Amino acid sequence: EKMYMKVTSVYGLTETAPGMTASRIDDPFDVRCNTVGHDFEFTEVKVIDPETGEECPVGVQGEMCNRGYNTMKGYYKNPEATAEVLDENNFLHSGDLGIKDEDGNYRITGRIKDMIIRGGENIYPREIEEFLYKLDGVKDVQVAGIPSKKYGEAVGAFIILQEGVQMQEADVRDFCRNKISRYKIPKYIFFVNEFPMTGSGKIQKFRLKDLGLQLCKEQGIEII
């Protein structure tokens, strides 16, 4: 307000400068806050099934892909890396998961590489994180896969509590019970003071797996 400016949300990658989607200043407040808006004019954005490559119907989660003037031609002198993200139809695969709604707005829901595969079930950490944020006393939460001898991976929740709050693992599981699918309820629950971060302040989600193994060892928790 001090700068007499209105804020919109823009989603994209360095490889899709200046972006892939954006909301408009005249969009409703909930659209500007809860989505990343429409695709840019003269570009194509689609949500595809990572396993089949087919375009997902409205409301179904898949990988965000982009084609158009805003898509890079390739990585400098690195054709192998280019081939990993640009397909034969010149669509760039972002690695991000998203959903397109009935109004054509997109919502980012997570990262493919963060997906937890538990006994053949695909579990998206962000879904569980958003659910656990509703638990009173939770300040911040991250969910990651912890290696499992039986299932390949199990769900691990790393929780930062609000100041002065005391909570037990049983409190978290009781909150989840009968509200989310049983296989999505965290097997391992860790109360931590901070998350591993980059120098720029981004959470290093890939390090949570190692942190979980370390905490299990320190606390005498058997990995099943």
Functional labels for PLM-detected ranges:
Residues 1-31, 44:
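Gly/Ser/Thr-rich phosphate-binding loop
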Residues 12, 68, 73-74, 81-84, ...:
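AMP-binding/adenylate-forming catalytic core of the ANL superfamily
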Residues 15, 52, 99:
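Short, glycine/acidic-enriched loop or turn micro-motifs at the edges of active sites
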Residues 30-77, 85:
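Adenylate-forming AMP-binding core of the ANL superfamily, especially NRPS adenylation
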Residues 210-224:
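Acidic/polar alpha-helix N-cap and adjacent early helical turns
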